[in-house]
Amino acid sequence: MSEERSGPVEFSANVKMYGRDEPLPRRHELRAGPLSAVLEGGDLRYVKLGDDTVVLRLYAAIRDRNWNTIEPRFLRYELDRGDEGFTLQFAAENVGDDVDFEWQGSIVGTPDGVIAATLDGVARRNFLRNRIGWCVLHPMELAGVTATTETPDGRVEGQFPNLISPHQPFFDMQSIQHETPGGGEVVIRFAGDLWEMEDQRNWTDASYKTYSTPLRIPYPVELKEGDRVWQQVTIEGKGGPPPSPKSGEPVRVTVDRSRSRPVPPIGLGVASHGAPLSDEDIALLRAVKPAHLLLPLDLTQPGWQERLAQATTEAGALDAALAIEAVAGTDGAGLHELAAALSRSNVEIAKVLVFSTGEMVTGESVLAGTREAFGAAGLSVPIGGGTRAYFTELNRATLPLDAMEAVSYTINPQVHAFDNTSLTETLAAQPETVRSARAIVGDRSLVVGPITLRPPFNPNATGTEPQPAPGELPATVDARQPTLFAAGWLAGSVNALGNAGADALTYFETTGWRGVIERRDHPLRVSKFHSWPGMVFPVYHVLADIAEFRDGEILQVDLGDGLRVQALALRDGDELRVLLANMTDATVEVSLEVPGARGSTMRQLDDHSFTRAASQPEDFRASSQPLGVAVGVD
């Protein structure tokens, strides 16, 4: 279903916040004796023993042959909860692409501190799957904690990894046991399959995940009609102090003026839709002051010369450098032609990252071929590589670092989960990728990007990706791109990666569904993407705010509750700017502490000012008002 929108539209508050009219899923607070948890649909979140989170999330995952998640539809849902226990019984079906799976689920919590989750399902037709079953997310704050697992071969003692582990830290798990910071103990037992753990920080999830069906077993696996799957996970907690009383205090955000780093160069991706920037786009984007435009260039495909010429023109119009991610053909085919084209360019080339066709990680031969081609053309530009995919691939590779001046990897927060809360959780894990990457690459330039809400492509697909159904968005597009949530996520990401020491960042694209401004030449819209031609997205204003401090510093910020409020603090001389972002759908009261600050003003981008900011960006950016002692962030 498509519709035509030619000018500003007054969307609902929910659409402005997170891209759809429907309210966020209802949450229920539950207790099982000393354990507490939050129920959301068929998932348990934030299972705590006292004040200590022992399970970040417990959920059932149905993944198709390309690792796409097939979401459940509940056929029956019954919750009975008391003061010290609860029982959830439900029936669900997961239907999508080739997958057709129906299952009965139960999650039961008892006063003795035990939560048991059971899955009993059946395939309703033949299909290929990579995974079906419960997943347990252990919080990343367990890094360095000793744990003991039961396996078929006996007890094994190990640790939750500190630096991000490229491979599984625990195998063949029947149970895992560890202490909590408060002095309690948690034991998690697994039945119905073989289980192992992976370090999900590789994909910026803020967790370690225990899952069923070890990856050493070839996949995808065919389920035949009538095949059954049964699993059970049991969480037991005991000991430790009771939880602290709930506080009605504001979320406290504290800026540390004594710890800072230079604001990293921040660029944008060249728009993948291919349409050139209009004069109006260029005028708006000059306020964002992108340090560079990143151009993915497949030298094996026809037309790359025209795309390079267009990107060069756009970079020049924006006073930006050009960064190139080049995929060369067999034996470096295309590299000499690329070098010749760049030697005629009149814009600065920030870096060239090179890969061989069909490869996700840079190899030694393509680097050597690039240096030979560029040397022959008399070009002297930084040459590097890394991975076109996630930090995982970088972490698992043996890189020819001696031949690299820059090392890169990408980030998107939706490899495993897609809800707002999970996306917000990833912000705490982004710095961990920088810390672990720095241990690999040393003092070489570490560049992160593209950083997008959805992946530009699926690097883990084992078959052809299905085309979107009519009225649906492509897998590369997120309906939250033009929303306030995306702006908050962006501010939190720049804070996380900038303070962690990334040397350069690339976010989103210039225009279009993956950009910071909507296209002006494309009035026919998919109704699930709420925009109008030329609309300025909230992420634009975050980047424009940062651009005004591009020669300054980024300051450390203590987030009192990062799931509710994200922040970014910038300083340039005597000027200080703090961006606060409410990551929820409710008003949050914030106590902002900035030692030595005075004479403050504020500008608020919320559901009330959204349309003005989107249609009259210059007028919106010129507005401000005095800032009080405490801020209610809408």
Model-derived segments and spans:
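Beta-strand-rich recognition/accessory modules
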Residues: 17, 31, 56-66, 93-97, ...
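Acidic-aromatic substrate-binding/catalytic surfaces of carbohydrate-active enzymes
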Residues: 2-91, 147, 290, 294, ...
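Aromatic/acidic polysaccharide-binding cleft in carbohydrate-active enzymes
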Residues: 226, 449-538, 558-563
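Extended, loop-rich substrate-binding clefts of extracytoplasmic carbohydrate-active enzymes
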Residues: 63-121, 196-207
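Catalytic domains of carbohydrate-active enzymes, especially glycoside hydrolases
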Residues: 269-302, 314-318, 345
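C-terminal beta-strand-rich structural cap/linker in extracellular carbohydrate-active enzymes
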Residues: 617-634
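Polysaccharide-binding surfaces and accessory modules of carbohydrate-active proteins
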Residues: 108, 112-193, 598-621
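Carbohydrate-binding surface patches
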Residues: 560-597, 602-607
